[in-house]
């Protein structure tokens, strides 16, 4: 197996220009495809997940071209030209979920599949929501999971659509992004969220981007959303993709652990991504944080003992970046408790289980529950001979690069899995650490 040995590292300092946000990139691509006219997308993330979306759109007859680092998408006006297709979605949840909803309203015959892990990631709550409006979606293997078969259907909306919010916010995002294409007798479509909505900041991203494409959704708390029916998606002409706030977390944590200053550029106070609030968590742990509209900078703690300190944090607002805190906890005095992280279990891998397993290999004491993780740093650091497993999960690989600030080298297995969102991560990380 391919692996990469890092550290031990003692210092982190420098500036990182972040790659584009995955969450924003795939949302923008689909909205541009549904809009009329051309949309120039600047700073799009170049990664496995965005390539999956671009290839799917091309298969569906949506034209796009690349000009330098820009992508120009020629929208379909809400009607994909190709009405029968088989689409391979890799392990891209941000692609398969909204596309499933969009295709259910297209009146075509489509099959969607992915890698084996994708076929273990739930999609049943979204399918249930779409079936409420008459969509014809069948499971080709296990009930509630891809692969899927979508057939032509008569879509009718005469009652509120109910969707669960406690498994993944991507189900609600998919409905919000695509239901404006549908017709409703009174011109409005109501979506009711059942249970507590997790990962609310990702819904904020969705609503913000919909508004950029001319779709204004009325939000009543986090329980009810009113979507305009039969709406026209209007291209903004040009749209910039912010830097990825989840990817920023590794460098900001490195600044906190390795002294800093480490500055990330591409996200800041004006960001629409919830994960920028990761910097607040580092500040609570004792790190020094500064920020502007488009940058964040972190230095180490000024405490007498030079250490960060453990915190207890409800992570609903930073679900992806919270993983980075679990590894940063190795360098904090006391125990760090991360709660409200149930969504980790249905991501690229079961991230609660995977994180607990790999932290223990380094000597940490870890308690895991259905939706929480408690991490106490190692009394004695260990170097696992078999390395750190990454579970084909880009965020596991990037998180555990921070373990190289410990007193022993750390071996990261399958480092290439970072291609999902940040192909040159380890080169960039190496540029600001020593």
Swiss-Prot record:
GO MF term set: 3-phosphoshikimate 1-carboxyvinyltransferase activity
UniProt EC number: 2.5.1.19
Positions annotated to bind phosphoenolpyruvate: 22, 93, 121, 170, 351, 395, 420
Any single Gene Ontology cellular-component annotation: cytoplasm
Pathway(s) the chain acts in: Metabolic intermediate biosynthesis; chorismate biosynthesis; chorismate from D-erythrose 4-phosphate and phosphoenolpyruvate: step 6/7
UniProt key word Nucleotidyltransferase: no
InterPro entries: Enolpyruvate_Tfrase_dom (IPR001986), Enolpyruvate_Tfrase_sf (IPR036968), EPSP_synthase (IPR006264), EPSP_synthase_CS (IPR023193), RNA3'P_cycl/enolpyr_Trfase_a/b (IPR013792)
Annotated residues for binding of 3-phosphoshikimate: 22-23, 27, 168-170, 199, 320, 347
Major location (coarse): cytoplasm
Signal peptide (UniProt feature, chain positions): none
Catalytic reaction(s) noted: 3-phosphoshikimate + phosphoenolpyruvate = 5-O-(1-carboxyvinyl)-3-phosphoshikimate + phosphate
Protein family: Belongs to the EPSP synthase family.
Subunit relationships: Monomer.
PANTHER family per the UniProt record, alphabetical: AROM/DEHYDROQUINATE SYNTHASE, PENTAFUNCTIONAL AROM POLYPEPTIDE
Function, as annotated: Catalyzes the transfer of the enolpyruvyl moiety of phosphoenolpyruvate (PEP) to the 5-hydroxyl of shikimate-3-phosphate (S3P) to produce enolpyruvyl shikimate-3-phosphate and inorganic phosphate.
Name of the protein in its database record: 3-phosphoshikimate 1-carboxyvinyltransferase
Organism of this sequence: Cupriavidus pinatubonensis (strain JMP 134 / LMG 1197) (Cupriavidus necator (strain JMP 134))
């Amino acid at each position: 197996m391919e692996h990469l040995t890092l550290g031990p590292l003692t210092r982190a300092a420098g500036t990182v220009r972040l790659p584009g946000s995955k969450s924003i990139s795939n949302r923008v691509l689909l909205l541009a495809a549904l809009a009329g006219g051309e949309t120039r997308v600047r700073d799009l993330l170049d990664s496995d997940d965005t390539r999956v979306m671009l290839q799917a759109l091309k298969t569906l007859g949506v034209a796009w071209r690349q000009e330098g680092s820009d992508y120009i998408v020629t929208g379909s006006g809400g009607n994909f030209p190709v009405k029968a297709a088989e689409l391979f979605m890799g392990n891209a949840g941000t692609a398969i979920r909204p596309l499933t909803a969009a295709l259910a309203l297209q009146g075509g015959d489509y099959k969607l599949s992915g890698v084996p892990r994708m076929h273990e990631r739930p999609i049943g709550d979204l399918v249930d929501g779409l079936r409420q409006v008459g969509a014809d979606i069948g499971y080709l293997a296990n009930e509630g999971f891809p692969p899927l078969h979508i057939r032509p259907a008569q879509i009718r909306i005469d009652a509120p659509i109910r969707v669960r919010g406690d498994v993944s916010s991507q189900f609600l995002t998919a409905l919000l992004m695509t239901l404006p294409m549908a017709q409703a007798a009174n011109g409005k479509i109501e979506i009711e969220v059942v249970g507590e909505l997790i990962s609310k900041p990702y819904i904020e991203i969705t609503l913000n981007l919909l508004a950029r494409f001319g779709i204004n959704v009325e939000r009543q708390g986090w329980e009810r959303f009113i979507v305009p029916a039969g709406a026209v998606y209007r291209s903004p002409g040009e749209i910039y993709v912010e830097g990825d706030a989840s990817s920023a977390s590794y460098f900001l944590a490195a600044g906190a652990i390795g002294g800093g200053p480490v500055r990330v550029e591409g996200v800041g106070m004006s960001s629409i991504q919830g994960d920028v609030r990761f910097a607040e968590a580092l500040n609570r742990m004792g790190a020094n944080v500064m920020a502007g509209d488009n940058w964040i900078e972190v230095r180490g703690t000024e405490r007498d003992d030079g250490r960060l300190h453990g915190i207890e944090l409800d992570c609903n607002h930073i679900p992806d970046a919270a993983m980075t805190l679990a590894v940063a906890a190795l360098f904090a005095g006391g125990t760090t408790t991360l709660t409200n992280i149930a969504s980790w279990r249905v991501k690229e891998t079961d991230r609660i289980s995977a994180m607990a397993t790999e932290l223990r290999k380094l000597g940490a004491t870890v308690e895991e529950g259905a939706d929480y993780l408690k991490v106490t740093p190692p009394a004695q650091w260990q170097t696992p001979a078999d390395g750190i497993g990454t579970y084909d999960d880009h965020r596991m690989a990037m998180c555990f690069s921070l373990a190289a600030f410990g007193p022993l080298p750390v071996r990261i297995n399958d480092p290439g899995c970072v291609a999902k969102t940040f192909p040159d991560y380890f080169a960039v990380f190496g540029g600001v650490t020593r």
